[in-house]
């Protein structure tokens, strides 16, 4: 079975435009309920959201769909994605739902689904749900399984949900340690963690400088958060803070800044935690699981210490799947999704930050020393925006394939090229890394030019937009 609605991180799109409409949310809820209902017990689903305006549309539509199928709904309001996974498990619920488009702008939204074990659904399960949606009104469609008048579900609010999540995150921090004496900037992206993140740090003893904690439905991720950490970095310098944290809209990813304002990505965080846990005998699987986007320097760093770096396709769900299958407990993405399976079933930016802070407190060293774990190779990532409705397939174009082969030949065995389509946005991502920064930039520029030549612009007369995401270091 193929998936058309679901991407690498659930269903995502522009709010009130197919597929991110109230009607589709209703269908998704009904189809998911039909897929998961088993036996005669009262089925329960947990629903959370971030702070987008469209959450007020999608949350009740999902609620109506589940209730119509006889499932009780527990509403927890704005909370991070990892909180949904945690609450789904702790409440013994059958499902968890997060209404969020993560790091995307406010006009997008999405639906992420979690099973009773707190893990995101498999590709096969998502395909089965899609098949039920496609069968709407026919045998096998969700409408065929509607609950009777006496069997409808109920919806209620769990008022102490934020407190439950706060205590769960704090429990991951070593007993006997506190954050006394540390000044920490935390950028909550005007998103799902705007209440809980500052509280966690404050309750552990830190002096907290909160940023982007005034959501208005429109400002989520706007010039703030993990994908725009400039304000956080500036605040670290302004307030002479010891560390800066930037979360994204649903708080499942983390970017840091040390006391000098230098940005620290997920690769350095994974290297730090992997090394620390290996030294303590806590690291499982003999290494770390990351994606094809992680810097080659991380792989070399781990190899020098007798540890392995296992690479998966892009998407934290694939990282988690490999961790579960092969027994790893540290994994993540360069973009800041950090998965620590001893504590959580999905990426949790706040939880990962506490592991870094524990290392800073244990060693008594500044963040600039603790977090510069390895020397990354020069790496450049650029995005080319295209119109998927135009039917063009840039990755299959002969000119693009020729540019990739030429780039690989120029880098030889001293670097690599990766080009892929984003699973969440209409972007072609072009990445190269190697020892020579100038050569890397030249290779990326040539491939980007080839992709642009093969790309249909989004609007008549508009050039394909290219955004440099991570400059070479």
From Swiss-Prot:
Disulfide bonds: none annotated. Activated by phosphorylation. The keyword Metal-binding applies. Belongs to the phosphohexose mutase family. Its EC number is 5.4.2.10. Catalyzes the conversion of glucosamine-6-phosphate to glucosamine-1-phosphate. This is Phosphoglucosamine mutase. GO terms for cellular component: cytosol. The active site is at residue 102. Coiled coil: none annotated. The modification Phosphoserine is found at residue 102. It catalyses: alpha-D-glucosamine 1-phosphate = D-glucosamine 6-phosphate. It is an enzyme of class 5 (isomerase). Binds 1 Mg(2+) ion per subunit. Keywords: Isomerase, Magnesium, Metal-binding, Phosphoprotein. PROSITE patterns: PGM_PMM. InterPro entries: A-D-PHexomutase_a/b/a-I (IPR005844), A-D-PHexomutase_a/b/a-I/II/III (IPR016055), A-D-PHexomutase_a/b/a-II (IPR005845), A-D-PHexomutase_a/b/a-III (IPR005846), A-D-PHexomutase_C (IPR005843), A-D-PHexomutase_C_sf (IPR036900), A-D-PHexomutase_CS (IPR016066), Alpha-D-phosphohexomutase_SF (IPR005841). GO terms for molecular function: magnesium ion binding; phosphoglucosamine mutase activity; phosphomannomutase activity. It comes from Rhodospirillum centenum (strain ATCC 51521 / SW). Its cofactor is Mg(2+). One of its GO terms (biological process) is UDP-N-acetylglucosamine biosynthetic process. HAMAP family: GlmM_B. Mg(2+) binds at residues 102, 248, 250, 252.
